[in-house]
Structure formats: structure tokens, C-alpha cells
């Protein structure tokens, strides 16, 4: 029967029920640009052959049996070029034929839709493919036979699907055209390659007429498979192809053509429709080899790099195309039921880098309010592309959100789960905590700091009392000091650890250390810095002497402290010193008397390297020794390229010779200096003299006398009493000698010269330096003769009241020795000139400390005088109510005043002027109280406003100031003056 196509045909899916829900689709065609008007809508002539018995009658089982009998076919004839208007039949005949076909389709759909209507579920899984899969299914649709027309239109209804309209096709055809071809079938099973011979009538495109084609996408279950035009590119014919009167749409004549694929919800009313769940139409689609096509699936070399969704059957023999002609392409990429079931479709040479679905909604989709089609989950499979090259499309990967079972079990273990709120859809591999230091952090447990000394706080194995308070540092009180040999003032020898770089002049060194003594008599020395050391002292020994009630033996103090670098000319470096000699010692014991433990290694006071000895009056390394000698003897005039404050250390000591020479001079190096050997007189004590006459030679038997054994050797008590008396007098150390040996080492401030000098940074550096110096002061007071006789509470009180006085007095001494009182020598790496004094916000106080240093220059103060005066300053401030053991304190202070008087009298240049010098020295001690009062006032102010001023206070100073501040402000502190004001 021959009929004419009509504008709008109802859908074949239960026409009466769905008529109001289906949108109208208009297809327009034209023969040429001049003939196109709004009324010039010609319908194509199609020849339909109704096969009898193709439609079963309400029998689901019968349809299953007849599925193998009916096969669709569509043939295309290229012999004619167009359709004449005289061949158009009446519209009434077309409507009658359409009604007959629709009624037949409706009868079948009523019988099978309840049993096999699963379209919605399969559509959400992405089961859409225009492929040849239903060879065993029943032919349910009438096909148009070849009737000599040039072109025909096949439009099979499928589930609403997203249209693919790439920009390249729009720009090529002059606009965003709507495709006139819809993917003809909906797949629920495995699909195979769609093929069509060249002689078949194509329902998809004609050789010259069709310029744009949309595509659909399918997937087998959860496995994505590309349809003939999966990649989202339109079937585009060359614009230069001549339009030979085809009724197909061209870009210039069909701008308003409604597309079945332009919107997912638009339904083309086609005279032929396939049921959603049973695709019984073979859709052989072919593109003739004479049309230059653009393919996003296969792009062989002879296709002029054009895009096409359908491979040319004659020129695509070696490409794996999504749609292939059976005569040319033997390898179809759309998986057939046999070869490619449950597998990924193989992309062509330009199909992209993986099995990716590019779902791009068309503009029509949003205009018509379509619901989004769920994106199928895809994942990129390694080696899924045989010879793939990334295509020109912007491929979007939708990563699978659910973690794979094998992956999660291998990475996270059996009990690992992914939190639904986790920002990562793919689980992150977590190492087991058995051999991992971070395992505890994953479980929520706090991790232990492997480097506790970097914390900046005080660390100790003792309780808080031991390492935060002065009582812990000073240790428990000892028995009374009565001068006997059995009771010593020093029950515990303080061991100074080898200098391992804690005093290294680096800015990065933390600022504190701690020394403590626990109840067991062990002293702990912690340096909180780049190097952390813990030292345990030796066990207590009996260290006493006979004839001096206030001072311990020399060797004890020599072992307890390292020699001071600046005072090494007055030390007994390298010379043995004898301890006291007990009464029951034998002569052989004297031979074995040594100096005790060997001295620890020293550091160079210039560069911080390991010192090789005392060179030119200063403990330095060999490199600095040679440098200083050559610089002074050669009279070099070095100039600093910076600000004369370069860092001189082991690595950078050769960078700036000017700053290195300046540091050598500040350390006290002098070519004329020679090492003093004050204790050299003790050297001869090691050479033992014959203490007993040799025994008489035995008489020979010839003389007739009987050999008599020698009498018992006299006891030590009787034989060595006279010699021990003289030795003891020779070994009696003077207080000045003891104070010299216990003088603390030089402490570095750790000042960073690279940062700009501000009041906050300078004051914070001074506070950190003061905390370090307080450790040295406590160690010094601990071994001070007579100080351990005082109760522990009195010791703490005296240190709290006098710490500022001791620090400023020591600063004046260093400034006097190193800069001749021209600068304030706080530390080797922190020297204040006039500029820094102004920047520190304490210029007047700095000038006051400098005036004290200038008094040292005027008086030419000696170290012996300085050391005794410093002890008197420790004992110069007491509570207003007195100490707990005031009598012991008064006795100790009186002894040191007498020692100062003796020292002044022994001075060789003070004949006749000793009393005057003693007066001047005591007046200098009185002047320290006025200076310290101003310093404490400034210190307390910065302590209260430390948060606002951004000034740091170490824990040691915080403890001392917290206890001292209320006592001083309440007037409980009482300074002791030598002279009335």
C-alpha cells in the first residue's frame, strides 16, 4: 500500500493512553533554498508492506515463540534523486494506514507490557543501544519497502535520552541543528555490531541530504558500551555536497526541524514504533564511502580528519569502530552477544583515553524541562585502549564512589570502613601502626615527642619541685659545718658536662638549661637546646680539710667546674692538685694521688670549635690562634661588608676576617699574654722524696753474726706526722683560689643578628640570657664555701633577693675585661653599643651599669677582689625579719669581709693605702643597691606588661620574679650597707 507521510503520528505505545503525554515533532524538508516557506512542508513517500501474522493476539507465550521468525530490514536505493509533487497521495489514505498500524501495535503492547515492561529499570542502568541484538526476537514492526524514493526517515521511539550536540557540528552547519534521526532501539540484552550493506535503504541518512545526526549511548548492565555515535559528535556531512532534491534536511533549509533526540522528553510521532522493552528492529546504518564524514569513534587517514559516528564500510578496515559495515570492518567495537558480552567496547583510534561516557545535555533538554538521566558509573580500565589517542572532546570521568572490596580490604584491612562524610570517595591507604610512629595518632592517642628538648620547657626525671624551684636545684640541706675532716661543706661534687655546643653562638639555640639534685644525691644537668645532655654526678665523697673551716679542698672545686676561659691565666690547667691527706695514709698512697677526673673538652671562645689550648690568653682553637697571630703581626686593616656584627662560628669564621678579629680582641686575646702558672709550686709535691732510710744490708755469715729480720716499718701516724704538717700548710687553699676555680663559664645569649633590633627582641634575648646565667649562679652558690651550711630556705631567699645584683655586677666585670668598659658585654654574641642601648628601651639603666664598669677601670679591680665582692653581694640583701639561721649567715658574711680586707692588704701596690682601697671597694658595693633597685623596678614593669609588650620571660625568671616581687614591693627586702647613707 502506498501512502504519504503525515506531520504528526501518534506513538505506538498504547496510543489512546499516551496521546496527551507525547509531544509533537515536526519534520520539515525542502528541495532548495528558494522553495522553502512555512507552508512548504512535504512529506516523504514511503512504501509500507504489512506482513500478515506479524502481530500476535494477546498471547505472551506466542510472542516468545515467534521472535525467531520475523526479521526487519530496511533497504535504501540510491537510484532516484528526489520525489515529485505529483506522486504525493492524499492525506486521508495516510491517516488510515497509520491508524491500522497503530491499532496493531496497541494490541500487542497491551498483551506484553505487564509481563516484560522493565524499561525504567534498564534505562537507569544505561541500557540504550542502536545495535543488532534481537535475532531471536519477533518482528513486530512493519517496514517500508523500497518504493523508489530518494530518502526516507526512520524514527523509532526510545526512552527519553540525552541528545548529543557538539559545538563542532553547530559551527560547521551554521547553527545548532536538531537531528532528525533518533536511536532506533532500546536494548535490554547484549548488543552486537550494527551493520548494513551498501545496497540497503538507510533509514538514518542519505548520501547527500543529512547534515546532522544525534546519537545515543548504551551499556551492558553496569558496563558502558559506546553506540555508533557515542562520543557526542553529530553525523555531519560535508556542506559542499550537492543537494540533489532530497527530502532530508540540510542546515540551510531545516533550521526548525524537530529532533527526536533534541530533548529527552520529546517523542517523535512515528508511523513505526518499537516497544521499549523489546527492540525488534534491525537498524542497519551505513554511510556511503563517498561522503567525507567526521567520526569520534574511528578516524582513518582517508576520512579527511572529519567527525562521524558511523565508519565508512570501505575505508575503515583496520579501525575498531563503534559502528562498522560488515563488508569492511570485521572487528566491531559494539560487543556482540558472543564476543563482547559484559566487556568494554573497544574505542577507535581517536575515541579517547578510556571507556568514558560523555553525557552532555543539549539545550533542548533544559528548555523542555526534562529530568536528568542518571549518569552511569564508569571507571577507567588499564590497557582498555588498544591504540587509543586522546580525542578532541572534553571527556568527563565520573569516578566510582563505592570503594572496591578488594581494594579496601588490602589497604584498610578487614574492619576498615569509609565514613559517609569522608571527603575522599576512594579510601586512602593507611599504614599499620605496628611499625609506624604515626600509628597512635590515627587511633586518637597522643604521640610522644621524640625530641623533648625542642619543647622549650624544662624537662627532668624529677618532680616539679626539683626542676622548677631553686630548692630542687640547690638540693637538700647538709649537716653542720664545724671544720672537722669528717664533715664537708660539699657532700655532692657538681660535675660540669663537657661543653658540647650548648654555649655555641648560634641564634637558633634555645634559651634554657636546668641543674637539679634529687634526694638521692644525684645532680641532673639538662641543656634545653640543639643538644640535650643529661649528666649524673659522681657519688658523694668525703671532701674536707683540717685547718680551714670555711673552704673545701682545691681539687674538689677544680673537678666541679671547668676553667673560665678569660681567667685561664690564673688557673692550674694541667697541674695536679693534691687533696687533703688523711692521717692513716701510707707512703705508697701518696704516689697514687692524682688530680681526679680528667678535664672535659673546651670550646673556642671565638668560633665555638673544639679548643686546642690556651692561646694568647684565651682558650681558642688552632685556627683562630693562627688567624689572630697573622692578623696582628701583619697589621691587616680588615673591613666588614655588613654591620660589623657577622656571625663567627666554625663554618662561617672565614667569611668576615674583620668581625673575626674583633671577636678575638673582645675575647681578650693578646700577643703578649702568657699562661700563668700560679699553682706550679704544687708540682713538686708529686715527686716523692725517700721517706725511710734503706734497711741495713744483712751481714754475711762469715762474720759470725746472726741475721736479724728488720723491725716492723713505723706506722704512718708516727713517721709522717712532721711531713704531713708541712704538706697540709702548703696545700691550704686561699679563698681567692677557690673562688677562681668555681667561677662559672661564659654563657651565650643566642642572639639572632639577622633580625632587626627592636625593644621586644632585645629584652626577650636579655631575659633568656638571664635565665641561663641564673643556672650558673645557682651552681656557683651551691659550691660556694659556707653557703651550704645555711638552711635551704635561706639559700633560696638569698638567691631570689640578689640575682639581679649578681647579674649586673658580672656584666660590669665582663665589660671591663673585654671592652675596657666602653660597651656592655652581656655575652660574646650580644654586646650593646650606644645604638642598642637606645633600642632596648633601657638606655639610662644601661648607662648606670656602664658607670659601675667604669669604676672597675678606675680602681683597676683584680679578679680576686671581684670574686670576693660578688660573694658579698650575694649576702647583701636579706628579709626584713631576718633569715631562719641568721647567726650562720652573719658568720659567713663576716668571714668574707675579712677575706676582702686581707686581699686588699696583700696587694703589692697598696702599701699605706689599703684602708682607702677597702673603703672604695665597699662604697662600690653600696652603690650597687641603688642601681639594682632601678633595674628591678623596670623588670617588674615589663613582667606585668609582658603580654602587651610582647616580651618573653623564661620559666626560671617567672618563678623567681613571682616570689620576689611581692616581697620587694611590700618592703620586706632589706639591703645591707657598709656605709651609712
Swiss-Prot record:
CDD domains: NR_DBD_GR_PR (cd07172), NR_LBD_MR (cd07075). Residues 234-258 have a biased composition (Polar residues). Phosphorylated. Residues 604-669 bind DNA. Residues 670-722 are annotated as: Hinge. Residues 259-300, 309-327 have a biased composition (Low complexity). One of its GO terms (biological process) is renal sodium excretion. Aldosterone binds at residues 767, 773, 814, 942. Progesterone binds at residues 767, 773, 814, 942. Transmembrane segments: none annotated. Keywords: Cytoplasm, DNA-binding, Endoplasmic reticulum, Lipid-binding, Membrane, Metal-binding, Nucleus, Phosphoprotein, Receptor, Steroid-binding, Transcription, Transcription regulation, Zinc, Zinc-finger. The modification Phosphoserine is found at residues 250, 259, 283, 287, 299. Its main location: cytoplasm. Residues 691-700 have a biased composition (Pro residues). Residues 779-782 are annotated as: Important for coactivator binding. Residues 723-961 form the NR LBD domain. Zn(2+) 2 binds at residues 640, 646, 656, 659. Residues 1-603 are annotated as: Modulating. Belongs to the nuclear hormone receptor family. NR3 subfamily. Composed of three domains: a modulating N-terminal domain, a DNA-binding domain and a C-terminal ligand-binding domain. Receptor for both mineralocorticoids (MC) such as aldosterone and glucocorticoids (GC) such as corticosterone or cortisol. Binds to mineralocorticoid response elements (MRE) and transactivates target genes. The effect of MC is to increase ion and water transport and thus raise extracellular fluid volume and blood pressure and lower potassium levels. PANTHER family: KNIRPS-RELATED PROTEIN-RELATED. Heteromultimeric cytoplasmic complex with HSP90, HSP70, and FKBP4, in the absence of ligand. After ligand binding, it translocates to the nucleus and binds to DNA as a homodimer and as a heterodimer with NR3C1. Binds the coactivator NCOA2. May interact with HSD11B2 in the absence of ligand. Binds the coactivators NCOA1, TIF1 and NRIP1. This is Mineralocorticoid receptor. The gene is Nr3c2.
